[in-house]
A protein has these predicted regions:
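Short, acidic (Asp/Glu-rich) active-site segment that either coordinates a divalent metal cofactor
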Residues: 105-142
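Short, glycine/acidic-enriched loop or turn micro-motifs at the edges of active sites
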Residues: 8-9, 88, 118-120
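Conserved, helical-rich catalytic subdomain that frames metal- and/or nucleotide-binding sites
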Residues: 140-177
């Protein structure tokens, strides 16, 4: 797991850029390895990024509750927007990007670098686009940004490791779960 306080060249899908605010964003990457056979199976390989996004959604909701916070009552849902965006009530809270990287000397597994960017404590006027959201704008009683970042990251890593182990065991079952 790699967490950063500042990102200078954030990017998203299709060469889009990701703008983060130092000290106010969640910028975390996790490297996992998966069997090459999964990556070659076009019926399931696209689900890895969605699984990572789903687990991030679960981590955000769980971490807010774990830290004693709550969501504003007008918030309907935090949801995934295919293929990699995390949205809350039509506004982008963040995104997930997964990239495959070969592992030198290993023919049966590949590395997947899963990066996540979230707006944690970015003030409304500093959000990069009109349709953006920040966790502090939709939730209340949140702790310091560093505490929130660590709580989300810890939940995400736990959930994702468990889900990826299940996916590796039976990728077709997990892709539709």
């Amino acid at each position: 797991v790699i967490a950063a306080n500042k990102q200078t060249a954030g990017r998203g899908r299709l060469d889009h850029t990701w703008t983060s605010v130092p000290g106010e964003s969640f910028i975390v990457s996790l490297v996992v390895s998966v069997p090459v056979s999964i990556m070659r199976d076009s019926s399931v390989n696209g689900w890895l990024q969605m699984i990572a996004g789903y687990e991030m959604r679960e981590a955000i909701v769980g971490a807010v509750r774990d830290c004693g916070g709550g969501f504003d009552e007008n918030i309907e849902d935090i949801a995934l927007k295919w293929p990699n965006d995390i949205f809350v009530d039509g506004q982008k809270l963040g995104g997930v990007l997964a990239e495959m990287v070969p592992i030198a000397g290993c023919e049966d597994r590949v590395a997947i670098v899963i990066g996540v960017g979230l707006n944690l404590a970015v003030a409304q006027e500093r959000l990069p686009i009109d349709k953006a959201a920040s966790l502090q704008l939709i939730a209340h009683d949140l702790p310091d940004v560093a505490v929130m970042r660590d709580a989300i990251a810890a939940r995400w890593v736990r959930g994702l490791r468990s889900r990826l182990a299940d996916f590796e065991e039976d990728s077709h079952r997990e892709a539709v779960r």
